[in-house]
Regions:
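Short, solvent-exposed aromatic-acidic interface loops
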Residues: 13-14, 53-56, 82
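Short amphipathic alpha-helices within nucleic acid-binding modules
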Residues: 22-24, 69-82
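Short glycine-/aliphatic-rich beta-strand segments at the starts of folded cytosolic domains
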Residues: 7-18
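Short amphipathic alpha-helical segments
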Residues: 20-48, 85-89
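Generic structural motif
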Residues: 17-19, 54, 69-71
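Short glycine-rich, basic-tinged beta-strand/loop micro-motifs
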Residues: 11, 59-61, 70
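Glycine-rich beta-strand-turn "strand-cap" elements at beta-sheet edges
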Residues: 1-6, 44-63, 86-114
């Protein structure tokens, strides 16, 4: 693997108590993930952010995948997100109850179809 092409990832699961809470969270995405926040993250090395709703029966979960240019970019963006998502700075997020599971890593193998 070429270290120059290494992509740092953060895969995050968010489990909600009910489907209704999860759906309300999804309707609030524009309040939580603002254009200003994305601009700041992009300037600090965020390449991509994906939010997916998990449709496994009996789960009320979303996943988020963050791709970063480098480990340094990850650290900068982690600090930005920590500050952005305080109850004071993001009251829209503060109203939800959920559990977060984080998995951080680097891409070691990837397939892309042409």
């Amino acid at each position: 693997m070429n270290k120059k092409n290494t992509i740092f990832l953060n895969s995050l699961y968010m489990d909600f108590l009910t489907e209704n809470e999860l759906d309300l969270f999804l309707k609030s995405l524009d309040e939580i993930w603002t254009a200003e926040l994305y601009t700041n993250l992009k300037q600090n090395g965020l390449i991509r952010h994906v939010i997916s709703k998990v449709w496994n029966k009996g789960q009320h979960r979303i996943t988020q995948v963050f791709e970063y240019e480098s480990q340094d970019s990850f650290k900068k963006c982690e600090s930005i997100l920590k500050d952005a998502f305080t109850p004071k700075n993001c009251p829209a997020l503060a109203k939800f109850v959920f559990k977060i599971f984080n998995n951080r890593g680097i891409v070691v193998s990837e397939y892309k179809s042409d």
